[in-house]
């Protein structure tokens, strides 16, 4: 038997007992591809053996973009019994197990497996002696629409989303003949009570289901945009936090679906309204001590500021992982509480990095406000950690904090102050990443092979098609030329 997992005999025994106690009929093995899509393969419980949790489960990796060619398609899923749960949506009782991907040709964890990359980033932090754990906490915003229509043909390009909350429905006659008229309006949706908030019951249902699958929630509310919401979940270590993002997205989409609606974590689905981010909180701990707490700006340590310096230094290329879609850059524009200016401040939501208010050293952390949920959380969190590590190693100065409303600065003022901005396109962020990738490759965390596979996937599946397709707005500006 070839042992490819770190599952102990006691862990395997514990899992089988869990399945028997819960009368599990199927075990659903789930893994994330490069883009961040959660995929699965299910086995009936009676077909499982203990050896499968040691040796792994074979699958065809050539069916996933950016992974293997058909001539070397065999890969192995390695179950990780650190984390599993009962799927609250399956008709038959199913246990969900997180998996990594193992390379049978090199006899090692697959270098293009996002979850394995996240684990390597955490290991790199420990190997350098810089910390025992990196805690991450994500705030994933989302939209819940009543319906969506999309067309992508050679002679027609359009989309249409709809929501009872939409200001475009003020004059609509609904099927019941009633239009109640209570709507938040553009940028008016932050925390109103019902009936303006039509999604309260769906959000509370989401919270209940999240608790069932082991996610501790602490806040739930309507967000600024029409049809937008947020559910806050407790932080965890880097890998756990990324696992939690996958859980959260699955639950939100499924609860919406079962309520006859459709949920999206797309960064900017509505023109003229706020977009959805994935604000990411980070701190590093060693010997049960928060290394970010100290005596410098707003209770931060010098160690923390160096970490921040690394993230700000590499942010333009880092965006290839944290803002991983062409749509991401329609969110990162002034005027919609989206942080496009690369600086930091305390309690200032116009900065790309915020230092949240805290009453103790243990609460010292950064909130990186530029990431969004189109990213693969394993890659986004791993890349943020690698940038911060580079900042610590090389003592990168983040510069002075800017405690002003940055949205009011003109482009000339931004240039005069020497402040960098986030890239304006996915193409530019990928180009910046390719020109600034050495810090990612330290400790063999992000391999050159993975980086090339990632950029190729993004260029061919998103950048090139987006650049080559006529846009409806171009017909307004150019058709009569």
From Swiss-Prot:
Keywords attached to this entry: ATP-binding, Cytoplasm, Ligase, Magnesium, Metal-binding, Nucleotide-binding
Binding site for ATP: 281-283, 349, 354
EC class: ligase
Ligand binding (Mg(2+) 2): 141, 223, 230
InterPro entries found in the cross-reference section: Gln_synt_N (IPR008147), Gln_synt_N_sf (IPR036651), Gln_synth/guanido_kin_cat_dom (IPR014746), Gln_synth_cat_dom (IPR008146), Gln_synth_gly_rich_site (IPR027303), Gln_synth_I (IPR004809)
BP term (GO), one: glutamine biosynthetic process
Gene Ontology CC: cytoplasm; membrane
Keyword Transcription belongs to the record: no
Enzyme Commission numbers on file: 6.3.1.2
GO molecular function, one term: glutamine synthetase activity
Residues that, per the record, bind L-glutamate: 274-275, 331, 337, 349, 369
Keyword Metal-binding (UniProt): yes
Pfam families named among the record's database cross-references: Gln-synt_C (PF00120), Gln-synt_N (PF03951)
Cofactor: Mg(2+)
Catalytic activity: L-glutamate + NH4(+) + ATP = L-glutamine + ADP + phosphate + H(+)
Subcellular location: Cytoplasm
Role played: Catalyzes the ATP-dependent biosynthesis of glutamine from glutamate and ammonia.
Subunit structure, interactors included: Oligomer of 12 subunits arranged in the form of two hexameric ring.
PANTHER family referenced in this protein's UniProt entry, alphabetically: GLUTAMINE SYNTHETASE, LENGSIN
Family: Belongs to the glutamine synthetase family.
Descriptive protein name: Glutamine synthetase
Organism: Helicobacter pylori (strain J99 / ATCC 700824)
